[in-house]
Amino acid sequence: MTSAPDQPPAACVLGTLPGTVFEGRRIGIVDLDREGREIGRIDLAEEALPDHVRDRENGARGGQSASGGEQNGARPRWVFSDTPKWYPPLLAAGVSIERCHDLRLAHAILARSELVTAPEAVRAAADWDAAPADAAAPEQAAALFDVDAGRGFIPQVPHDLEATLAEYVRQTAAIETASDPGRLRLLLAAESAGGLVAAEMRAAGVPWDEAEHDRILTELLGPRPIRDGKPEKMLAKAEEVRAALDDPRVNLDSPNRLLAALRNAGINVASTSKWELQTSEHPAIEPLLEYKKMARLLSANGWHWLDEWVDEGRYRPVYVPGGVVTGRWAASGGGALQIPRQLRPALRADEGWRLVSADVAQLEPRALAAMSGDRAMAAAGYGRDLYSGLVDAGVVATRQEAKIAVLGAMYGSTTGEAGALVPRLQQNFPAAMHLVDSAAEAGRQGGVVSTWLSRTSPPPGEGWQRLQRAANRFDATGADEQRARRAAGDQGRFTRNFVVQGTAAEWALAWLADLRLRLARLPEFDGTRPAAASGPVFSRRAHLVFFLHDEVIVHAPAEQADQAAEAIRAAAAAAGRLLFGDAPVDFPLDLSIGERAIKE
């Protein structure tokens, strides 16, 4: 049954409908007005969904529908159970949307946010504590999502219409009764926009030069070996290590056997880690470190990786928005967040196109200055490198000292050079330091903290609570008390960093969301060299292809590269205003335009 609304819907809730094999899959859409009241229902075949969505999106522009009629109205917010479930098929059909509300992402925020005054209904809907539709296998995904212990792993959220509508009603009630609904809505809109960006970047793919990748591997490791063998330069380096250890048979890939060989050679180390090995000056150490670096490249981004993740000149990783509890993104496949610098030359634009790359200088310290209202810290970095600004202000002697001090303040370093420098920040930037110190104290006491837009940290687990209870027993030992103090300190360092890293992640989401819309407003390129491998939505217009915490890369027609660069700058400025208003903090960019995305 189809009941079309008389007015343009403010929101459209999508979900699957029950049906038989012979009927084919059907999709239900519930149209809602601005007050959340139902104004219509639509029942259509799954294959008809792209045209329906296209009609709704084009109608907002006064465009022509797929049936040829003129349409006018506001673009709706599409309510998805999970963006990776619904958006990729639309993109494959050449349809993009302006905005959505991702129920899975929003559920994770609302179930924990301190702003939600009545979270019981949302928390009780445990079916929505799940991995995204395109996540890795459970044993991999569990580490990414930080689902509360004891709740178990749920493969996917419900996608049927009634369950989706019920969750949307729960979430709407939680938002409307929150202590600051506006702040919460902003966070959920940014998080949902991030879900759209992740799907779009996977659909478009990162332009990747397979021949250049192979050339780099061959130069560093030797020619591609047959089957699973090691390349010749690695084999030669391994022999160099064995000769220096005077052990011709040691297996360098076995930590236990390698450690035994090192000790037999008089190298007294506790492990085979890079940091441990660097403490020795034995002649075997330098080639061993080189071998380990080669082995990492081969296993993480070698020829097998190239075969699996790059196809038709595109690298398509699986991004996981909100995959880290702070709101940072993770990746459940392809290693998008760990591309080594030596492979960056393989990021190559299509012919007639350019890669526009930009990263933010000192994003987290700037976010700290803005959220704490520390005008002195903001002034130190305004319009320039923040670390150099600390030197000019006389806080520290060198830029390196400034970096060590700031990172120490955000991560809770109390020893070494950082421990000696942090007190200078406390003296010069009391507001910023008070914010992170207060967050750390809350964590030590077992409390939770929130980011600027109200993403709230998870409480300590049962193991932490058990340690604290043991230390407070009348018969507690010194060892019990030491373990409790250590656990409290670890939790304090976590909450100290949570507020800063999480707020920086919110700024980055706002940057992405604004940039995505600015790029979509650029005119389509009508030249003779479309980026066909980027898919039907993006083959003729500038689009995001890569994001890493504080860095974006846009693939743009050469004629639009300067416009794309200006869009990146404007979006960064807009993100700062959106989150922090007129706070005297800027977010300067290191921006470049080229055929390759080489990072120095």
Give, region by region, the residue ranges found by the protein language model.
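Conserved "right-hand" nucleotidyltransferase catalytic core of DNA-directed polymerases
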Residues: 1-30, 34, 149-153, 160-339, ...
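Conserved DEDDh/DEDDy metal-dependent 3′-5′ exonuclease domain
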Residues: 9-178, 362
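Polymerase palm active-site segment centered on the conserved acidic dipeptide of motif C
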Residues: 52, 80-83, 220-251, 428-429, ...
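Short glycine-rich phosphate-binding loop at a beta-alpha junction
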Residues: 74-86, 251, 359, 546, ...
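Conserved phosphate/anionic-ligand binding catalytic regions in large, soluble enzymes, centered on
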Residues: 109, 252-260, 316-334, 355-369, ...
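Function-dense linear segments that define catalytic or interfacial modules
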Residues: 123-124, 129-132, 142, 155-166, ...
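Conserved catalytic core of nucleic-acid polymerases
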Residues: 203, 392-547, 586, 590-600
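C-terminal structured "cap/appendage" subdomains that terminate the fold
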Residues: 526-586
